[in-house]
UniProtKB/Swiss-Prot annotation:
First and last residue of the signal peptide: none
Positions of the GST C-terminal domain: 89-216
Cell compartments where the protein resides: Cytoplasm
Organism this protein belongs to: Schizosaccharomyces pombe (strain 972 / ATCC 24843)
Protein family (similarity comment): Belongs to the GST superfamily.
Domain GST N-terminal: 1-81
InterPro entries linked: EF-GSTs, Glutathione-S-Trfase_C-like, Glutathione-S-Trfase_C_sf, Glutathione_S-Trfase_N, GST_C, Thioredoxin-like_sf
Keywords recorded for this protein, A-Z: Cytoplasm, Transferase
Cellular component terms (Gene Ontology): cytoplasm; nucleus
Key word Cytoplasm present: yes
GO molecular function, one term: glutathione transferase activity
Name of the protein this chain belongs to: Putative glutathione S-transferase C460.02c
Length: 220
């Protein structure tokens, strides 16, 4: 069934989980390439905060906030969930939501990803001290996750779930931009978790697995 249209771009941190979930649930969604710095006027009228991704259903239903969109997709397609991605009881549902909120609201936040992510993208000039200090703060936060996944293969239960699809895909920006070989050795459990979830979430359909030897900021 055609569900509607996602407005974002394919490699946006919060977009691949939506595309992959829709694919696994046999939901047809379109992706209209949309960027923060070129947010269409008509779309801004519907979503004045101009955050990505946003979704407009085939029936005109408008929805923002990635967790809300993600959960809406699952509810619309859960009859096609042949992998057991969803919760089997209220406890699992609460645990899945906990992990999604944690990565979305406590880790992938402006306080943790800026200014290093903006410098990496070239949207602000590179400044060595600011880049390294902000990247170090981000890595300190990732050390918390490293301990949380130390004895876990999956976040909820003993199978790949919605929580892993969401959480794993949200880690990409860190591994792509600021986690070099030395740092991966400091984050062995997180690295194992990310690589495992990268493959189980089939994220190679959206971007390659990038585990750089060194951090190199592109010349802008």
């Amino acid at each position: 069934m055609f569900l509607g249209t996602i407005y974002s771009f394919k490699t946006n941190t919060r977009t691949p989980c939506l595309l992959e979930l829709a694919k696994r649930l046999d939901l047809q969604v379109d992706l209209v390439e949309t960027y923060h710095h070129k947010f269409p006027t008509d779309l801004a009228a519907k979503f004045p905060l101009q955050k990505l991704p946003v979704f407009i259903g085939a029936d005109g239903f408008e929805l923002s906030e990635v967790i809300a969109i993600f959960k809406y997709f699952y509810e619309k397609g859960k009859h096609n969930d042949k992998e057991g991605l969803g919760p089997i009881n209220e406890i699992e549902e609460a645990e899945m939501l906990k992990w999604m909120c944690f990565i979305n609201f406590d880790i992938v936040t402006p306080q943790i990803v800026r200014p290093w992510v903006d410098m990496f993208r070239g949207s602000v000039p590179y400044e060595d001290k600011a880049f390294k200090e902000s990247a170090a703060r981000a890595i300190d936060s990732l050390k918390i996750i490293n301990e949380l996944v130390k004895d876990r293969t999956y976040l909820v239960g003993d199978r790949f779930t919605l929580a892993d699809l969401f959480f794993g895909s949200m880690l990409r920006r860190f591994f792509h931009s600021i986690i070099d070989e030395k740092t991966r050795k400091e984050l062995p459990h997180l690295t194992r978790y990310y690589v495992t979830m990268f493959h189980q979430a089939k994220l190679e359909a959206y971007y390659p697995l990038e585990l750089p030897l060194t951090v190199t900021v592109p010349n802008n």
